[in-house]
Amino acid sequence: MHLATSIAALGIVGCSCLRFAAGQGSSTFRFVFTEEPGQYVVGLRVVEQYDHSRTFQLEGGSSEKSAGVGSPRPLQTLVWYPAPRSNNRTMTFGNYEALIKTETSFGKPVEDGKPQKFVESYMEGTTDLPAWAVRDAEMHPGRFPVVIYAPSLNAPATENIELCEYLASQGFVVIASPSMGATSRSMTVDIPGANAEAQDISFLLGFAVSLPDTDMSKVAAIGYSWGGMAALFAAARDKRIDALVSLDGSFRYSPDTPHQAADIHPDRMTIPLLVFSRAEETLETWDAMRQDKNQCACAPNVLNEWTQGDLLHVRLLAISHIQFSSLYQRSERFKKDGLHFVPADYSLEDGIASYNWMARYTLEFLNAYLKHDDTAVLFLKRTPAENGVPKHLIALSLRQASHQPEQANTPAKK
């Protein structure tokens, strides 16, 4: 689980359009999530469960020797949910960090494995900061829409804590598990890897049915990077998913992967899709990626094919791929090295603002298409400037499904 490996594997950094600054970042920079919480307190429950339909090879400690072959697939499941107000103490980011130690070992902490070292390196200096969630809080009465979050390549379920807590505070049950390969902790950038995470999404939806606070008639999937590919696969196969959100999903950069899967047909999908993309690459960068057989093959573009469902494309002009994750932006490492990734003429602070707007647009999209909220619909139809977004941060396009009337003032139901 190495960030540089993830970047290289997915072609997610275009060298020619990024600023490789001589400086070492800003000593005053601090990532702050500024969106206001909703009406609910956030609860968090951690469920250790297995998918007995699939086998998994466990790894043990620093030796990385197999501790068990043919074991059922472990899925450490994080559930953020609306909770009633209380005087209970909220978690810290250090409490979240500790979860990685039993991510696949369940009750047998691993201190120095690759996932543990990865999370520790990005949590360093932030462990005392307060989060929003209250561990094991009571569930708020009622039933709420379900959102499954699919992390990026090899990433933990805690990759976007702020986004998940924010949505839970606004009345959603958000569920996540780690990004893992088909038979082991290491994810692979291929169809078996995407299939594995897509199956995890469907497994989590099956688990969500058992929760007393979920409304399974309103379901969305969110995927970041390689998780975006997996979420696309899941949405194409699992008809319980009513809406899809892609945080710079890999299907834009590896269109041949869904094409090779044979049963993924974006041109037939009728659910709404919200796509966030980073600062665009230059033509030279795209040409270089085309020379990589894993990137930009001659296959139909998913967004161009997405004509039967509404498509909202939000271009975040000020950020690079890794800035879609609060785990990265919040870290001391990013504070030191972030300017190496930021697009030219933008600042680290622009990246903070962009992340916050990403969360806001995600919320409004889910409110519009899952809760059918008229105010959210109007928000999505306005220009970014009309919504208060600084003009240099976002470019937006909204294309309604081909079978819908142009004048429709409410999102189409699935």
What is each stretch, according to the model?
Residues 223-227, 231:
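Gly/Ala-rich beta-loop-alpha elbow adjacent to hydrolase catalytic centers
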Residues 126-185, 253-254, 283-285:
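Short substrate-entry loop that stabilizes the transition state in hydrolases
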Residues 221-223, 247:
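Short beta-strand immediately N-terminal to the catalytic nucleophile in serine-hydrolase-like folds
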Residues 159, 189-216, 233:
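Alpha/beta-hydrolase active-site loop
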Residues 83-122, 158-185, 191, 313, ...:
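Active-site machinery of serine-nucleophile hydrolases
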